[in-house]
């Protein structure tokens, strides 16, 4: 009797006892055979579904709610502690013959003082990498005091490295662009690729290596161009589109569910236990618009979430303690939205089942 709605990660059973059951079964087989190809107008299909439900249920569509501001990435930064063990001009001149002198020179230029967080991070990494060789040279020259000053400065940079990495990656303009909401979802998620997944994974690998090998100078090497290119790829990421899509789904499916609950309480489809023309129309709307159009899009969104969120969490997790509280609150809001998708759909399916449960075939 029942036909099944399958989404990876959960199984939902939708009982449609009228003639539309055959159409539903056919649509499900089509979905399986075609790989559940993503529709290109998910939000529009949700709107059409709501409008058709309004006509058949006689219940007005609940008010439209705006996108929650709590789901927008907060614009915050983590202040970097001031450097101790400063190198003065005389010490700088004594570094002749050390590659580190070039690094310090770049830091003290106008460009160095106004460098982006990502460029400052690369300068810090280079500084840490170059200190051991320069320190050894200074000790050979009989200047252990300056060597010790450099070593202490290097340790200071290492201690604040989580903050430096967080400012460069998770609080930088590229990450902000990654989570920026698009004006419209258009073909999303059919218009995405695996390139952003690869970029996130590579950034995570770099960050993890920098954090895990603090005592190994040879492991600090960072290709400036590679790092900046990876950051630039974040600008084309679809984090904002994913959150926007899930917010729309949660809002509109919840609105549809509220309409069905109201109908079931005040004007059931089959008040005398037999199917009606109204129940048949409702059956057709669910089969055609929810199962045939919306459900494949929901499956595609879930698949994209699983692909995207895993590397995002891997990148964020080691840096969480270095992030401001506002960012932690935002990630909680974001992840709660993305995780309650299944519950929202299940509740809607349950409302559909209840609506048709008293409609025996005549």
Placement of each model-derived feature along the sequence:
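Bacterial N-terminal signal peptides that target proteins for export
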Residues: 5-24
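Sec-dependent N-terminal signal peptides
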Residues: 25-31
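C-terminal motif of bacterial Sec signal peptides marking the signal peptidase cleavage site
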Residues: 33-35
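A cross-kingdom marker for long, charged
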Residues: 39-64, 233-362
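N-terminal Sec/ER secretory leader and immediately downstream segment
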Residues: 40-194
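Polar/charged alpha-helical tracts
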Residues: 47-51, 55, 132, 136, ...
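Extended, low-hydrophobicity segments enriched in charged/polar residues
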Residues: 155-261
């Amino acid at each position: 009797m029942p036909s099944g709605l399958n989404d990876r990660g959960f199984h939902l059973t939708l009982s449609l006892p009228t003639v539309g059951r055959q159409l539903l079964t056919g649509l499900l087989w089509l979905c399986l055979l075609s790989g559940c190809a993503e529709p290109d107008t998910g939000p529009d299909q949700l709107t059409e579904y709501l409008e058709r439900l309004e006509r058949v249920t006689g219940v007005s569509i609940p008010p439209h709610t705006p996108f929650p501001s709590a789901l927008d990435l907060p614009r915050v930064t983590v202040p970097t502690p001031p450097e101790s063990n400063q190198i003065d001009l005389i010490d700088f001149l004594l570094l002749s013959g050390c590659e580190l002198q070039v690094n310090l020179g770049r830091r003290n230029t106008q460009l160095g003082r106004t460098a982006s967080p990502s460029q400052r991070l690369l300068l810090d990494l280079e500084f840490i990498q170059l200190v051991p060789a320069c320190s050894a040279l200074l000790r050979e020259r009989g200047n252990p005091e300056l060597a010790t000053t450099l070593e202490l400065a290097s340790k200071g940079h290492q201690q604040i490295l989580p903050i430096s990495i967080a400012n460069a990656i998770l609080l930088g303009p590229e990450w902000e662009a990654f989570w920026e909401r698009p004006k419209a979802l258009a073909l999303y998620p059919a218009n995405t690729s695996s390139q952003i997944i690869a970029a996130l994974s590579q950034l995570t690998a770099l960050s993890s290596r920098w954090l895990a090998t603090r005592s190994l100078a040879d492991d600090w090497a960072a290709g400036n161009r590679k790092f900046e290119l990876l950051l630039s790829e974040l600008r084309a990421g679809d984090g904002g589109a994913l959150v926007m899509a899930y917010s729309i789904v949660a809002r509109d499916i919840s609105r549809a569910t509220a309409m069905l609950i109201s109908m079931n309480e005040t004007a059931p489809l089959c008040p005398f236990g037999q199917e009606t023309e109204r129940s048949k129309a409702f059956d057709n709307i669910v089969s055609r618009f929810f199962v045939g159009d919306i459900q494949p899009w929901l499956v595609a969104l879930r698949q994209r979430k699983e692909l995207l969120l895993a590397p995002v969490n891997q990148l964020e997790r080691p840096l969480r303690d270095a992030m401001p509280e506002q960012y932690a609150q935002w990630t909680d809001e974001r992840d709660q939205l993305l995780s309650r998708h299944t519950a929202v759909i299940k509740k809607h399916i349950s409302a559909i089942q209840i609506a048709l449960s008293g409609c025996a075939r005549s």
